[in-house]
Each structure stands twice: as C-alpha cells, then as structure tokens.
C-alpha cells in the first residue's frame, strides 16, 4: 500500500514538474528552431556569426512585400524562413501593462507587480530605486514572454517634460526638471534592458520625441497641434531627457510624437530623427511612431498630398517602425512611384531586426537562453511586492506638518475616521498605462492595520457633485481621535486625452475638507492622490488641517505605504518633482504657449521652477521629514579653470561654447556634511542647485545633482557630489548653443551656498 502511494505521488510530482515547464516555455520558438532542418542552417540563424552579418543575410532573403510586412507593429510571419509573426507594441510604464496588444493577462499569468505611477516614484529622487524597479519589471516581462503572453519590446518610459500643470499625462512623466527626467530615463532603461550593450533583456523605448505635452485642451488636440518651439528651449529643456536616455541609458528605441514641431510632423522630420537621434546621439536601436501618427500626418495634418508621400517622407526621415497599418499599406506603392528606394526600407529593417537579434529572438530555443528559466513563479513575488511598497514609501511627500501632528500614534489615536472619495481607492492608485495588479491595499485597509477605523466616503467619487454624504462624514470626524481625508483626482479628471482646466480640487471636495476639519475632534490629515499639482492653498492656511501628504498614485501597495507614513513606521523623504502653482497661474496662460522663459510682452510668466519666480503653493523640491537635517559644505573649489581648445577667439564675451572647451573630466567636486539633528532616523534627499551668472540665457537656478542618504539620529555623513561642468553648469543661448558662463556660479544645497568662479584658461593660465 505504501509503495502504491509513493508511486502515485511520484506520478503527481512528474505532472506538476511537467506542467510547470510547459507554463514557463509555452511560447513557440520565434525563429531559427533547431528542430527545423530547412532553416536551422541558414546564416542568419548562426549564433557564431556577428549580428550585423546575420541581419544583412536575412534582409537579403526577403522580397519587397515581405520587407514591408515587417514595417508595422503587428509584423507578419515569414513561414518559408521559419519566422513567426510578432507584436511589437507592449507597455511597461511602471509594471507590465496590458494597454498594448502584445501583452495579455490570464491563466498562470493573471497579474504583474504594479509599482507607483512614475511621478510618485520620481519623488524619491533615488536613481538606484528606479533601476531596481526596471530590473523587476523586465524579469516579469521576460517570464510572460516565455509563457507566450507578453512581448519583449516595451514602449516605455515616457520622459516628456511636465511643462504645464494641466497636462493629463504629467503623471506618467519624471516631472518638470530635464536633468531629473534624463536621470530617471537612463536608470529605468538600464534596469529594463540589462547591462550588456550588445544583448538586451527587453528593449525599452523613450517617448514621445519631442515637445509633446498637450493632449486635448480648449479645442486643441495633439493630432492637430503645431508646437512652436525655440532652438533654445529644444536644446535646454525638451531634448535633454531623450539625449540622456540614448547616450547614458543606451536605449533600444525612441518614439516620435503626434504633434508637429515648428510646422513639421516629428515622425517625418529628418532633422529630429536621422540627424539628431541617429547621427548626433548615436541611437543603437530603432525609431517607432506613436500609434497611427504616420496616418495622422497625412489624414489629419494634411502634411503631404498623397499617402505614398507620407510613407516615403517618414521612412526617409529615419522612421523604422510604424505603430499602425499605414506603412504596410502604402510603402510598396511609394517604391513603385520612385518616392522611396528599396534600400531605404532595408535601412529601417536593419534597425528593427538588429534589436530582435539582440533580444535573442533569432537564437532558437527559449529555454537555452539567459532568461529562459523565468516563469510564473517569478511574477508577483514577495520581493517584488516589497519593492513596490518601498517605492511608494520613498515617493510619498509630506507637504505640511504643523506642531508635529504626524506621525499618529496607535496608542493615542485608537479610532481614526477615514473619509474621502479616494479613501477606499484600489485601481485609482496605479494610475494609467497599468496592468492587472497582484492585489491591492486601499488607504482605509492600510490604516485599519494601525487603528480602528470609521469609514465614510463623503463623496460618491472624485467629481463630488453634491453634499448628500457630508453629514455622515462630519459625524465620523466628530467621534474619532484623528481624521484622515483621502481626496484628489483620478483618471476621469487627468489622463491621456484629458487635460485639466483647473488646478483646484474637483466639485465640492474643498467644501467637504473644510467642513470635516471644522468639526473634527482630533488632528485632521489631508492625503492627496494625484499626478499633477493641486492648488490647496485653503488647506495650507487652515490651522484645523495641521498636516498634508501627497501620495501621487502610489501603486498596488499604496494603502500600506500611506498608513506606514501616517503612523511613523516609515519616515517620509520624498520631494516634489514639480512646482505646485496657484490657480491664478493659469490666468492668460494657454497650454499652447510653448515658451519656457517669461514672455513679458504677452504676460507669460515662465514655466517650471527654472524660469518662473512668482508665488507658489509648494516649490519644486519641497518635502518634509519627521526628523531634521542640516548641511555643511565642507569642501569645494573656489576657482575652476576651463581649458579652451584652439585659438583664443573661442572665448566670446562672457561665455565659452561647450564644443570649444576641454570637457573631459572637467568636474566640480563638492563635499557635503549631512547631520541628523532630529529625534528619528531618516533618509534625506539632498538637492544641489546652480545659479549661473545673470543673463537672458540663464535659468534663475537649475538642478545639477541629487543624492539620497540615510542618516541615523545624531549621525553625520559626508557625501561627495561630482558635477560635470560642461553638462550641468552650462546654459543655452538663443541660437541653441550650449555655453559655459564665465564668472561666479552659486551652488545651493538647502540653506547652504558656495560660490565657484569658472574662468577661461589656455595652457593652464587663466584668461580674464
């Protein structure tokens, strides 16, 4: 009997192992199947042959019709060469998403880890965290690819600048600062793609190039919008994240946008695609259109007279892949009409097929490849969920804390009223471009882990159109030891296709907050969920609301993270990655006005902290802690000589063109002592700003470095920051030339400042 049971268990174990193997490797071999004798010996299938030669061999075997069938996101199969069809469009903005058709949840892959929305994660100012998230997302992406339910080409991240606070997609971005956006882009991309420059774990894509930050405002939509942008703003704002993504992140793809820039659709502009991305920055990858944007430039923008001209213009400009059917429908006729050469099509395929080969898609059996072991057991793991919680904790920003109202205490605040339309939020917490989360902890569930809760929504939803639920909310606050109001926005207010018209809380939310605060017995904590900034000046000024927290969209573990912050299990260290403007900022400021700098003749106030110096609700970089940190600039040079290449004439006026300076290893080293003089251990986000010498070129200040450092109570830590002079202390003139201003540059870290003088020199001798 025992032997029979053992035999039965052995059979069950065999089937479990077998089914697990099937789950991991349920995808058919994409190409170069070693079991297919007809194709296994083809040169493009030989791993010993360099990838460029394999790509050329494959293209040489294709007919024109077959080549064109590979130009769209839904690439056709080439059965005679043993190549399966492939869907290029997958998304992984902050976790594997099912927005694109390349990824489907279900079966043994019901979900994936959903991290905080990008704007929240960026508030951590933690580049190592950003890269760690990328590694987790790519592990889960590879696992789903192995299981036949995901792709390997992910059109993420979105690295556009949050230029205008009304933009519905601001939540997807790394905020308003171009250096932060670029650092985020490079870090997340490295996490996604891995560290092998010749091989890829997955292929990332930085989007949407360029000057795209308007979806649908006041009758103007992204499909019709012509962004009129100066060379100065292109160089020092809009292009910076993309340049860093390519040069520092080695991204495998760039996506061009729907809008025109100075009258030319971005996806048909050779100056943007071929000259800038490909030749100047050295993209090692492919350029893809935003979905249907090639069709948009013909059908909607009427940029060309015929569809064949639109196809030809896009490919000749440097576009390699069309998200949509347009190139597939019109490229053959463009070749027949001599608008396009077949070699132009070949050049596009070189870039896409090279990426597929770097991904291992032409290397045969998945199981034999470096990531072939990944499967269902590697998705939604406890470690991944823990990182999602950590990311939310690090990104949450404490905006106000008068009288040390926070953290709450489970002993003193035994009963907490949890009120507001986002108090029981789940899907709202993951923002847009998300997938199916592993599970959710809502704010009220998180707080219930620390205290008894009285839950009243107060508003049916974030639109808060009436006050019929107000009385119950007020009564809950009257009877509780503390009150937490979870208010804000969701995707019905701000999203793709939805730009805001106001920075105020929607509907009657402000009235609910004020009425509850007035009646509450204990401290009132306002928690905000949003991607963009909100004008909550009323709450900042209200003494009955002693604490305010911005949670952004904190991801699947958001409720736990919020509760951990409120009750002090985690010490907040996040900083705002965007300026919070008052509602009055929008007066006479159309979203269509692209100038970053003030335009006094039009009463345009300037955009972002770099160029706007008017009143704010909260400034860029604002964020409090439960402890207190001090800075001391312990060591920094007072003079840095800038060696000039060639003749003395390269020093013009009060600046040196970066192209004329010897920039290699030209670095400003600053040693900063950070001391925790408070009563709790904490992590401090140190932001380093530069104030260049005055002049019409220069921003009033610009972020040049940031570091996140954990400091225990009473501890002092010395942090070294190295600032690349040519990259970060330069400014851009009106012609779009990057220059190093000669003279005194102020370096500011909190309340500490230091002046360093940059001086031109020849052969080590400083020139006045």
From Swiss-Prot:
Q: Null phenotype? A: Partially redundant with BXL1. Bxl1 and bxl2 double mutants have shortened siliques and curled leaf edges.
A family per Pfam:
Fn3-like
Please give the residues the UniProt entry marks as glycosylated: 126, 648
**This protein's GO CC annotations:** extracellular region
Q: Which GO terms describe its biological process?
A: xylan catabolic process
The active site of this protein is located at 290
Main localization category: secreted
UniProt keyword list: Extracellular matrix, Glycoprotein, Glycosidase, Hydrolase, Secreted, Signal
Q: Which residues form the signal peptide?
A: 1-23
Note the PANTHER family from the entry.
BETA-D-XYLOSIDASE 2-RELATED, SUGAR HYDROLASE-RELATED
User: Which superkingdom?
Assistant: Eukaryota
Tissue note: Expressed in leaves, stems, seedlings, roots, inflorescences and siliques.
Q: Which organism is it from?
A: Arabidopsis thaliana
- The catalytic activity of this protein is classed by the Enzyme Commission as 3.2.1.-
Q: Which family does it belong to?
A: Belongs to the glycosyl hydrolase 3 family.
State what this protein does.
May be involved in remodeling of xylans during vascular development.
UniProt-annotated location(s): Secreted, Extracellular space, Extracellular matrix
**Gene name, please?**
BXL2
Protein name (Swiss-Prot/TrEMBL): Probable beta-D-xylosidase 2
Q: Name one GO molecular function term.
A: xylan 1,4-beta-xylosidase activity
């Amino acid at each position: 009997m025992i032997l029979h049971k053992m035999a039965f268990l052995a059979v069950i174990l065999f089937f479990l192992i077998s089914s697990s193997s099937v789950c991991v490797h349920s995808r058919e071999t994409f190409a170069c199947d070693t079991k297919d004798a007809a194709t296994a010996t083809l040169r493009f299938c030989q791993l010993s042959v360099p990838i460029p030669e394999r790509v050329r061999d494959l293209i040489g075997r294709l007919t024109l019709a077959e080549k064109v069938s590979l130009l769209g996101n839904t690439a056709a199969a080439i059965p005679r060469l043993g190549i399966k069809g492939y869907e290029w469009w997958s998304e992984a903005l902050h976790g594997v998403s099912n927005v694109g058709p390349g990824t489907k949840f279900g079966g043994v892959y019901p979900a994936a880890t959903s991290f905080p929305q990008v704007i929240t994660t960026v508030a951590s100012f933690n580049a190592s965290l950003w890269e760690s998230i990328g590694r987790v997302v790519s592990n889960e992406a590879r696992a789903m690819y192995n299981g036949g339910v995901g792709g390997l080409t992910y059109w993420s991240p979105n690295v556009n600048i949050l230029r205008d606070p009304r933009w519905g997609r601001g939540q997807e971005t790394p905020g308003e600062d171009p250096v932060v956006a670029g650092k985020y882009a490079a870090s997340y991309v490295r996490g996604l793609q891995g560290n092998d420059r010749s091989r890829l774990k997955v292929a990332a894509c930085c989007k949407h190039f360029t000057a795209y930050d308007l979806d649908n405002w006041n009758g103007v939509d992204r499909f019709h919008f012509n962004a009129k942008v100066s060379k100065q703003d292109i160089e020092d704002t809009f292009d910076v994240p993309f340049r860093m993504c390519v040069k520092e992140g080695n991204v495998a793809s760039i996506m061009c946008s729907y809008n025109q820039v100075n009258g030319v659709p971005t996806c048909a502009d050779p100056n943007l695609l071929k000259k800038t991305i490909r030749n100047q920055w050295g993209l090692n990858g492919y350029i893809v259109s935003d979905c249907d944007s090639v069709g948009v430039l013909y059908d909607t923008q009427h940029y060309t007279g015929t569809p064949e001209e639109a196809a030809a213009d896009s490919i000749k400009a440097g576009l390699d892949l069309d998200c949509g059917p347009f190139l597939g429908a019109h490229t053959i006729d463009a070749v027949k009409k001599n608008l396009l050469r077949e070699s132009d099509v070949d050049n596009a395929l070189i870039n896409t097929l090279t990426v597929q080969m770097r991904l291992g898609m032409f290397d045969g059996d998945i199981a034999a490849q470096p990531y072939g072991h990944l499967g269902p057991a590697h998705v939604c793991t406890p470690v991944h969920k823990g990182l999602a919680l950590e990311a939310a904790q690090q990104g949450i920003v404490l905006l106000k804390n008068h009288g040390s109202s926070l953290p709450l205490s489970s002993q003193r605040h035994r009963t907490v009223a949890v009120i507001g339309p986002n108090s029981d939020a789940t899907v709202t917490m993951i923002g847009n471009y998300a997938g199916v989360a592993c599970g959710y902890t809502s704010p009220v569930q998180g707080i219930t882990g620390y205290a008894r809760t009285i839950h009243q929504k107060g508003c049916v939803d974030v639109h808060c159109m009436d006050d019929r639920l107000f009385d119950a909310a007020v009564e809950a606050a009257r009877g509780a030891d503390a009150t937490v109001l979870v208010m804000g926005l969701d995707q019905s207010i701000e999203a793709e296709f939805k730009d805001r018209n106001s920075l105020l809380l929607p509907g009657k939310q402000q009235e609910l907050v004020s009425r509850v605060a007035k009646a509450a017995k204990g401290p009132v904590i306002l928690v905000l969920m949003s991607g963009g900034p909100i004008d909550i000046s009323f709450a900042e000024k209200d003494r009955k609301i002693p604490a305010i927290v911005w949670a952004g969209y904190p991801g699947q573990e958001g409720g736990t993270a919020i509760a951990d912050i409120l009750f002090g299990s985690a010490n907040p260290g996040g900083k705002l990655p965007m300026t919070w403007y008052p509602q009055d900022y929008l007066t006479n400021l159309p979203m269509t006005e692209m100038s970053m700098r003030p335009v006094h003749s039009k009463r345009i106030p300037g955009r972002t902290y770099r160029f706007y110096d008017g009143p704010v609700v909260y400034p860029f970089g604002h964020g409090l802690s439960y402890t207190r940190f001090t800075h001391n600039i312990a060591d920094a040079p007072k003079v840095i000589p800038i060696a000039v290449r060639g003749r003395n004439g390269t020093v013009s006026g009060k600046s040196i063109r970066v192209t004329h300076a010897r920039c290699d290893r030209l670095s400003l080293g600053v040693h900063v002592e950070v001391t925790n003089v408070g009563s709790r251990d904490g992590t401090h986000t140190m932001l380093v700003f530069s104030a260049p010498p005055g002049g019409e070129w220069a921003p009033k200040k610009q972020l040049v470095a940031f570091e996140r450092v954990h400091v225990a109570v009473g501890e002092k830590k010395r942090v070294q920051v190295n600032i690349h002079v040519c990259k970060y202390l330069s400014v851009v003139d009106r012609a779009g030339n990057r220059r190093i201003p000669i003279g005194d540059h102020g370096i500011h870290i909190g309340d500490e400042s230091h002046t360093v003088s940059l001086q031109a020199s020849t052969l080590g001798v400083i020139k006045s």
